[in-house]
Each structure stands twice: as structure tokens, then as C-alpha cells.
Amino acid sequence: MNKNICIVAGARPNFIKVAPVIRAIVNAQKNGQSINYSLVYAGCEDDPTLEDSLFDDLEISRPDIYLGVDCENLNELTGQVMSKFELYLQQNPTDVVIVVDDLASTMAAAIVTKKQGILLAHIAAGTRSFDITMPKEINRLVIDGLSDILFTAGISNNSIANKEGAELSKVYMVGNVLIDNIRFLQQRMKRPQLMDDKQLKEGRYIVLTLNRKAIINNSEEMRSLVSAVVSSAHEAGVPVVAPLRGKARQEVEAMGLEGIMLIEAQGYLDFSYLTAHAMGIVTDSGNVAEEATFNGVPCITLNSYTEHIETVKIGTNVLVGEDADRLVLMTKVLLRGEWKKAGIPDRWDGRSADRIVQILVNE
């Protein structure tokens, strides 16, 4: 009997994490296993963040279904996703729903799945900030609490998942699916034309990314942080390359700083090459920090916590919060080449998705 799996993505970063699972399902099909999948996106078909190159780079097809939800209010978004995803499940026989990470749309899909009596699996389970005032922390608690199967990326996540949900859920430490992509795409990565255009040399620039609304919406704080890293790097003659979008780009552009190169948002392969060959990275993205650990690139995270503490305990990541003085201090350590010794966490081996699919096939 065919096993029908529905994979839900709520935003662009989710596709990067589910892509290895989709490729593993396709390989399982080629090997004669009875397994089908559909990819459902909570957003709209014309979402500008879902450029064709993203799917080409990841070697997956675009979503089969778009729920078409597009709103800023998280409660409204949750309600719309629940309503539309429920209709989808009623019309499409599904054995397992896979959700990833901790978005409001992810939580909405998880709730509907359980109400329909369908098996629910959560990738990147057991991640916690331990700050219940954060909407995403509430999402994580709800999703993990409802899930039948919890797929964790590391030992600390596994410990949390076992402690909180072992009686109701099956917990599997499968490793980090994000790393599957890097290993899969390594041979296809090539030096982007942008680096020639900007005369950038491998190992002689810092990449800066900003995506967290908490930072971007606080103009004074964002300017302070950007100024801290750019001025420190400029003193050392090292350019800061910043692929920024929207409000963040406008704010930084208005600062008129020397030593920063504002560039367009890059495709996944080009961005991966850019970060893998940087002297260091300053980011507020957990995904970027995880990839930096795998690539052995020093990383400064503009946050006081990380969902994957292995990137700090074992990897190249250092947390500075939103503290501009500490950011200056760590940027100078980076520029002096005095970064801490680091390694790669257990099971970040590029085979996480294969483990996930085989577990689901056997359920």
C-alpha cells in the first residue's frame, strides 16, 4: 500500500530544510518503495522570496499546492492556514504530515493534522529558547506537544524532546537536515560572478545578514549593531558584504557607511558559496549559523540564544545578543584570526533525510 506524505512549508527557509527529505523520498521511489509526497506552501504562488532559482538550486519541484495565505497578523494567519489546510486534508488522503521549524503556519498545520487524526512528524523538534514571551517558543511547545514523531538535530534537542514528550511521542535524533543540502550541493557550488564584480577574495570579507524583525524594527539598535561591525572591519581593511532586503537595506543605505557593500539577495547556491568562503559571518539567522559551523567559518550571532546550542558548544558560533560593544570585541577577535577551535556536531553527516524517510516508511 502506498504511503502518502504531505510536507508543509510556511516560508522560504522551510524549503531549504524539507528539500533533502523530498530528494530522499524520490530516491526511495526509484528504489521501489511505495511512498508518495505532496508539497504544500502556506503562502502565495507569486511570493517574491520563492524565486525559480531556489527550487533549481535545491533540485526540487515547486509546491503542488499553495494555500494562498498572506497576512501580517499572526493570529489571523493561523486561522486562515487552519481553515485552508483542513480543506486540503479532507480532499487528499494523507497518512503522514511533516512540518518543520516553528512558524505560526507550522503550528496551524500541526493542530489541523491532529484534529483530522493523521500522524504528525516534526523536523527540528526539541528546539527551545526558554522564553515563553516569544511567539515562536509557544509554537514550538504546541507543535512538539502534538507530534507523534519528533525528529531532532542534536543531543540537546533530543534531551528536551525526550524530557517533554517521550510518553506520547517517538523521538529520533536524525541529525541536521540543513547539512544534507550543503553536502549535496558542494560539488555544484562555484564562485559567483558577484565576487569578481566586487573584487572580493576568498577569506578576506565578512558577510552580514539581518532578518529578525526585533532588530530591523528597532532602527537605533540596528544602526548601532551595523556600525559596530562595519567600523571594526573597515579599520582592518576588510569589507562587509551585506545581502539585505527591504527596510534593513533602506536603513543601512541611509547610514552612508564606508566599508560596506550592499548587494542584492543572492540565490541559494551563490549565497552558500559566499558564506562558506568568508573570513567570518555576522548574522541573526540560525540557519546561517548552522551552515557556518559545518563550513568551519567563524560566526557571530546577534541573539542571546540559539535553538541549536551545538553550534556554540562544539561549532564556530558565538552569541553576542544585541550588545554593540560585545559585537565590536568579537569582530576584532575574528579579524585577528584568534577564533576558537571548533568541530562538527554528531550526525551532521548529510544523511539525516534518509534516516527520516526510512523511519516514516516503517511506521
Please name every model-derived segment.
Residues 4-9, 15-26, 30, 54, ...:
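Active-site and donor-binding regions of nucleotide-sugar-utilizing enzymes
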Residues 37-44, 239-245:
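Short internal beta-strands
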Residues 44-61:
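N-terminal beta-loop-helix "entrance" segment that forms/cooperates
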Residues 44-49, 68, 146-220, 320:
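A nucleotide-sugar donor-handling region in carbohydrate enzymes
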Residues 52-54, 190-277:
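Donor-nucleotide binding loops and adjacent catalytic segments primarily
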Residues 85, 89, 273-278:
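Short alpha-helical donor nucleotide-sugar binding micro-motif in glycosyltransferases
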Residues 99-100, 111, 122-123, 150, ...:
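A donor-sugar binding/catalytic signature common to diverse glycosyltransferases
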Residues 156, 318-363:
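Leloir-type glycosyltransferase catalytic cores
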